[in-house]
């Protein structure tokens, strides 16, 4: 009886404890859930997305061409050393206060709430086309006339400098043209016997009717206008460095020709860069040594060397493999006293996770245009490469067949092909230098390069290899007889050499024997067919 009573008490106590534990756990779980859903609590990823210099708002369901234009905007802002968040209009209304600079790309008229919210915030706003701009102008009560065009053929013209102006024909759809008193205007659009500015600004409101930034003039002009738009002070923004790059120079390039080009740059007091192709094997061959001797001469006379990314493995997703290739290539040059200060890569490295990991070993990165294989993803929402702190050098902008555009508002590289004759290369160099911009030396900037078992950096024009200062003075190489190690072919060659000696001995002996046989045969034939003469008989007949 006592046992049953004690058991009953114990069971009741156990049940009470279990219920208390359940309610406590439920409260903890509810608190955790409410904390996770609280707007005051955000993840690191959300914080990263919201912290940026520029917010780009785009319309719903962008077309392929619109995605390419958005990519141009993101790349341009990135080259200007700014961070950018890109979101659809539906995700942007509640976060407008977090950004000082806002780009509205092709926003349609059904975004009334967004336009009202934009009109209420005093931000630096740039519109690319879209008929929602009329709602924004109305909400701001600007004295600006808006003319809507469903589809129209226009002539675009833009002056990059007083001496560099370009024009072309374009077709615009679903856009608006503005007329009014503006604080700033640049470029000209001619349409249906009317004219408008390509870019117009009134206070903090900027507008362009063109949304196709794949157009050569638009992509180049935006690089200049974006720098002005982001500049918070009066006047023009500060100048960026411009570079001349002899592009994709292979070790088998004739050293005499390369020396002539280098001397041409030196004699004309030009700052220049040589982009060398990677070498993975046979880096000790005399041809490589002669190539590096010319590079050292260029390096000692103000030229800089950069390494071109491996073409053969550019699409690999294996970071370790790419690092290995780059280490082999770097060592092939540093072994001869040549120090590539930067890496040259396709632009798709900027938007690819593996590419960004590879670039972490370089502070300075030169970019190539790569339209065919874009890695840009609209769902990334942020230019992640910005966080890595690289100095990114954009490729120069090409308009038409041969017209390159360099401007001081963005740092660009003019790539000159060396796969043409010497005089054509010199003409290209002269054409680039005639642009009204200053081309600077890569040695004016500090760089850092890491590899598997080495690193080097430049500081104030001096170079340090594994923390030891290195002399960049040019001294000619001495050349010795080189034994080419060809692996299996080497012992085959030795075997053939030995066999050749044996064959030569056999041929000599055979020739001697053959000669003896000839003499013996002639002697026997003479005895057999030619009769000896008899004495006293002149005719040799009895």
Language-model segments: which ranges?
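Catalytic grooves of carbohydrate-active enzymes
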Residues: 233-234, 241-255, 349, 389-448
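Cytoplasmic C-terminal tails of single-pass
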Residues: 526-542
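Active-site beta->alpha N-cap acidic-glycine motif
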Residues: 218-219, 227-297, 301
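Active-site-adjacent pocket scaffolds in enzyme catalytic domains
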Residues: 145-146, 282-286, 295-297, 304, ...
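A glycine-centered loop/beta-turn motif at secondary-structure junctions
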Residues: 52-53, 98-99, 124, 143-151, ...
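C-terminal domain-boundary segment and adjacent tail
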Residues: 233-238, 263-269, 273-282, 364-377, ...
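Metal-dependent polysaccharide deacetylase catalytic core of the NodB/CE4 family, i.e.
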Residues: 52-59, 126-139, 268-362, 372-377
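A glycine-rich, often tryptophan-bearing local segment used as a flexible ligand/cofactor-contacting loop or short
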Residues: 108-167
């Amino acid at each position: 009886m006592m046992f049953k009573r004690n058991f009953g008490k114990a069971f009741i106590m156990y049940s009470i404890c279990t219920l208390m534990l359940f309610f406590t756990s439920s409260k903890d779980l509810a608190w955790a859930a409410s904390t996770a859903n609280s707007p005051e609590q955000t993840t690191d990823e959300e914080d990263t997305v919201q912290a940026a210099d520029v917010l780009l708002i785009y319309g719903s369901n962008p077309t392929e061409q619109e995605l390419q234009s958005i990519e141009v905007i993101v790349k341009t802002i990135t080259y200007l050393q700014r961070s950018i968040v890109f979101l659809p209009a539906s995700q942007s209304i509640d976060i407008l206060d977090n950004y000082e600079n806002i780009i509205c790309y092709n926003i349609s008229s059904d975004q009334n709430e967004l336009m009202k919210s934009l009109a209420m915030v005093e931000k630096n706003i740039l519109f690319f086309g879209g008929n929602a701009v009329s709602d924004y102008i109305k909400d701001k009560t600007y004295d600006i006339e808006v003319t809507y065009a469903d589809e129209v053929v226009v002539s675009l013209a833009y002056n990059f400098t007083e001496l560099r102006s370009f024009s072309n024909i374009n077709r615009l759809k679903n856009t608006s043209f503005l007329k009014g008193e503006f604080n700033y205007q640049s470029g000209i659009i001619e349409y249906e016997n009317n004219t408008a500015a390509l870019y117009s600004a009134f206070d903090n409101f900027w507008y362009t009717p063109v949304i196709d930034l794949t157009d050569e003039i638009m992509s180049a002009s935006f690089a200049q206008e974006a720098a002005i738009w982001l500049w918070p002070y009066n006047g023009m923004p500060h100048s960026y460095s411009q570079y001349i790059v002899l592009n994709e120079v292979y070790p088998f390039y004739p050293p005499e020709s390369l020396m002539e080009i280098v001397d041409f740059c030196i004699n004309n007091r030009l700052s220049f860069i040589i982009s060398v192709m990677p070498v993975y094997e046979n880096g000790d061959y005399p041809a490589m040594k002669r190539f590096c001797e010319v590079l050292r001469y260029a390096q000692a006379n103000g030229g800089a060397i950069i390494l071109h990314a491996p073409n053969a493995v550019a699409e690999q997703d294996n970071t370790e493999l790419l690092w290995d290739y780059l280490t082999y290539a770097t060592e092939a040059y540093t072994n001869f006293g040549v120090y590539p200060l930067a890496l040259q890569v396709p632009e798709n490295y900027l938007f690819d996770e593996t590419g960004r990991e590879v670039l972490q070993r370089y502070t300075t990165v030169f970019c190539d245009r790569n339209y065919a294989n874009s890695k840009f993803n609209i769902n990334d929402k942020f230019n992640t490469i910005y966080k890595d702190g690289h100095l990114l050098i954009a490729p120069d902008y090409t308009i038409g067949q041969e017209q390159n555009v360099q401007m001081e508002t963005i740092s660009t590289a003019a790539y000159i092909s060396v796969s043409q004759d010497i005089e054509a290369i010199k003409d290209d160099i002269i054409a680039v230098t005639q642009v009204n911009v200053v081309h600077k030396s890569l040695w004016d900037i500090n760089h850092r390069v890491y590899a598997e078992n080495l690193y080097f950096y430049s500081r104030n024009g001096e170079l340090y290899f594994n923390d030891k200062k290195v002399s960049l003075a040019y001294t000619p190489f001495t050349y010795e007889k080189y034994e080419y190690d060809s692996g299996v072919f080497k012992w085959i060659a030795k075997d053939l050499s030995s066999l050749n000696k044996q064959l030569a001995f056999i041929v000599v002996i055979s020739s001697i024997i053959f000669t003896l046989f000839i003499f013996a045969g002639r002697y026997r034939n003479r005895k057999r067919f030619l009769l000896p003469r008899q004495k006293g008989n002149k005719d040799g007949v009895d």
